[in-house]
A protein has these predicted regions:
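Active-site-proximal alpha-helix that buttresses catalytic centers in soluble enzyme cores
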Residues: 1-150
Length: 150
């Protein structure tokens, strides 16, 4: 269910697809976390589609997801990197993959669809709150302490 602050996204959220882009990993946890984030965003009912894509090591790839979304008649596709900070992946690798995928699907997309590349998570007080919550949980013994696991 959409939260009050979700309404700021716009009245046409139903015409927007969001692609959460992760790095990818040989371990299953990375993909599982991204899928859970996708599920939670999807439950808000804001967007027509919410998908996950990976740079490497997992599927689906960025290119595969964009090509599939290109055929759905959406007005906007927002590519949201799920990375904490800017780096080579967010400033070079992902934009290049998006460009290649978008150009490859241009025949299916047409001129009226926009691909928007969002910023990584970055420095944000909401992240500070999460970090402080995790520290508090650790101090209060709600999480496994390192000395217990050694």
């Amino acid at each position: 269910m959409a939260k009050e602050e979700d309404r700021d996204i716009g009245e046409n959220g139903e015409d927007i697809a969001v692609v959460l882009i992760g790095h990818g990993s040989t371990l299953p946890y990375n993909k599982e976390v991204l899928e859970e984030l996708r599920r939670r965003i999807e439950l808000r009912g804001i967007f027509k589609a919410v998908r996950v894509a990976f740079m490497q090591l997992n599927s689906p790839s960025i290119e595969e997801v964009l090509r599939n979304l290109a055929k759905d008649g959406l007005q906007k596709i927002v590519a949201q990197p799920v990375f904490l900070a800017d780096g080579a992946h967010t400033t070079e690798d992902i934009p290049e993959k998006l460009k290649v995928a978008f150009e490859g699907a241009w025949e299916d997309i047409g001129d009226d669809v926009k691909l928007i590349y969002a910023k990584p998570i970055g420095e944000d007080d909401r992240i500070v709150d999460i970090l402080l919550d995790r520290v508090k949980e650790a101090v209060e013994g709600e999480l496994i302490r390192m000395e217990q696991s050694l």
